[in-house]
Amino acid sequence: VGFVIVTFQEQGESEYKNCELDKNQRQCVQYALKARPLRRYIPKNPYQYQIWYVVTSSYFEYLMFFLIMLNTICLGMQHYNQSAEMNHVSDILNVAFTVLFTLEMILKLMAFKAKGYFGDPWNVFDFLIVIGSIIDVILSEIDDPDDNSRVSITFFRLFRVMRLVKLLSRGEGVRTLLWTFIKSFQALPYVALLIVMLFFIYAVIGMQMFGKIAMVDGTQINRNNNFQTFPQAVLLLFRCATGEAWQEILLDCSYGKRCDPESDYAEGEEYTCGTGFAYFY
């Protein structure tokens, strides 16, 4: 797969072999043509400006980064069959972090107002995390373990873990790395289409060559892994591509295997299914 991706990128670069600009220079020109000025909201109210100055400062960013890391460490300290005291401390810490992140949301709402706050997708994500965390705290307080009609709060406890994703919005370096990761997926659809075509071709060939092999439990060609139907053939090929017991599948598809009772084999040819082509396949 890596070789296919590298070859695809090289073929794309070959289209510009006669261009006087290299790849970085072309990207700079495209960026200059597509760039748009960024609008930054600065409040005119002096009290609102003071709050805005605090929440946009690097010290505030470092503080929230520290709180997120501390929250992550606290989540990592939880373990199976922990004591009641540990559960109590975890609940208290969860409430404390929820209050702090709620305070951050309120300060940003006061600094940017609703329009400016919700104009940033990261702020919308933070807002959803805070709301989910508040619901988690409320349900944790009203949930009674001895009550048969207790509320399931497993889903809302996922918001505790989702706070870690907030780290992606902290720091220019992290955002640059995330943007680079997203941009690397631009060529992925074409590579994925090529891989799908290869799987399709190989699945059809496998159905023709190994589709008559009997499904025997205890072997690699069974009711779950076989070439008798197209979906099963694709799944089996995917298993081979991941390297899971591919050599055993190879041997079970070689010549001399028992034929499926419903296949059209002649009398005395019960063990003539499979082919040596499996070694090349």
From Swiss-Prot:
Any GO BP: muscle contraction
Q: Keyword set for this entry?
A: Calcium, Calcium channel, Calcium transport, Calmodulin-binding, Cell membrane, Disulfide bond, Glycoprotein, Ion channel, Ion transport, Membrane, Phosphoprotein, Repeat, Transmembrane, Transmembrane helix, Transport, Voltage-gated channel
Enumerate the intramembrane stretches of this chain: 233-251
Question: Mind telling me how this protein is modified after translation?
Answer: Both the minor and major forms are phosphorylated in vitro by PKA. Phosphorylation by PKA activates the calcium channel.
Subcellular localization, per the record? Cell membrane, Sarcolemma, T-tubule
Q: Where are the III repeats?
A: 1-8
Residue segments, region Dihydropyridine binding: 1-17, 258-281
One of the Pfam families matching this protein, by short name: Ion_trans
What pairs make up the disulfide bonds? C259-C273
User: GO CC terms for this protein?
Assistant: L-type voltage-gated calcium channel complex; T-tubule
Where are glycans found on this sequence? N81
- The answer to whether the entry has keyword Lipid metabolism is no
Annotated GO molecular function terms are:
calmodulin binding; voltage-gated calcium channel activity
Catalysed reaction, written as an equation:
Ca(2+)(in) = Ca(2+)(out)
Q: Report the family membership.
A: Belongs to the calcium channel alpha-1 subunit (TC 1.A.1.11) family. CACNA1S subfamily.
Q: What does this protein do?
A: Pore-forming, alpha-1S subunit of the voltage-gated calcium channel that gives rise to L-type calcium currents in skeletal muscle. Calcium channels containing the alpha-1S subunit play an important role in excitation-contraction coupling in skeletal muscle via their interaction with RYR1, which triggers Ca(2+) release from the sarcplasmic reticulum and ultimately results in muscle contraction. Long-lasting (L-type) calcium channels belong to the 'high-voltage activated' (HVA) group.
Assembly and interaction partners: Component of a calcium channel complex consisting of a pore-forming alpha subunit (CACNA1S) and the ancillary subunits CACNB1 or CACNB2, CACNG1 and CACNA2D1. The channel complex contains alpha, beta, gamma and delta subunits in a 1:1:1:1 ratio, i.e. it contains either CACNB1 or CACNB2. CACNA1S channel activity is modulated by the auxiliary subunits (CACNB1 or CACNB2, CACNG1 and CACNA2D1). Interacts with DYSF and JSRP1. Interacts with RYR1. Interacts with CALM.
Query: What name goes with this protein?
Result: Voltage-dependent L-type calcium channel subunit alpha-1S
Q: Which organism is it from?
A: Gallus gallus
